[in-house]
């Protein structure tokens, strides 16, 4: 082993043969033995360049050696006085020049320091729940929060239509459906009679009085109270004035809703007869107007998940709300006003059914416009029934073409289903 200034050196051959500890070749160029691992610094930045020195003399020891041969074999340590450091090329053995430590460059293959982790150590520390901000739940309305609560769908539809009608009245918007003039036998009719709800006082219809035997209602038909007699119409003008609540409307079927308190009578009657528990009016919906998620919302007019505004875009649907069908929401209904000749006054049974029905929320004045097929006159139906009874008796006679076309098309005009045409068909068959 060769030590120079307490640094281990060996010749090039011993370094390559991994015999640096037993090297004694001091007459050769001696290379500095590096520590294990990759070198941190290269001489002149070149991996083939190594720092080398040349031995000049052997330093003499002060004490004489005893058993020198045995000691050298066991501990072959030689201390030399070397020359200055030189740079030698290991591949060729050529001395490049003196070694300059300032020109030494660090190794490019030096291990890089590991980058800090993306997730810091503090993120794994458990924090207290009181320090972390809590997510505050937004305010929800009563109809969205409590799903088990019974919803009064009748009240939702009732308030929606009532608000729509009041809005139309306040904005002075009128809806006009003009009657088309129909001629029979090339003659123009002078007047078109309109049939609607007769404004009769309460308790004048059988089944509407809820009093006991001591009833004191004026004109009560149920308990036979005759203190008040309802005047009956005696002239054609009085009948027209009674059946037509819209006076001086110039032959319009519907012009505008009258601003009277009679329309509130049906809303009060329905609200008292309904068996559905009333909804909580104190809890108002806090959803945005255009993004309400409620299934049944009275504030925004939503019924069974459908917006009533989308259904009642057509004004004829709003007027025909008595025929409201929940299973056919957002459906299309033909917009065609019905001629006044096919409109008949409602009977008492029909009026009672509309009052007791759960889905009837609008005064019967709005039922003047109906999209159902037109109803034939009663006398025309009777005559046609008689014709059907005569067919088995006279098999040779063929039915009239006018009768066949009359029953195929339900939307024929009055000319095809008039009394005169039907009676003429009867006279032909009986001859």
Curated annotation (Swiss-Prot):
Its main location: nucleus. Transmembrane segments: none annotated. Disulfide bonds: none annotated. Keywords: Activator, Copper, DNA-binding, Metal-binding, Nucleus, Transcription, Transcription regulation, Zinc. Pfam families: Copper-fist (PF00649). InterPro entries: Copper_Homeo_Regul, Cu_fist_DNA-bd_dom, Cu_fist_DNA-bd_dom_sf. Copper ion-sensing transcription factor which activates transcription of the CTR1 copper transporter under low-copper conditions. Promotes filamentous and invasive growth. This is Metal-binding activator 1. The lineage of its organism: Eukaryota, Fungi, Dikarya, Ascomycota, Saccharomycotina.
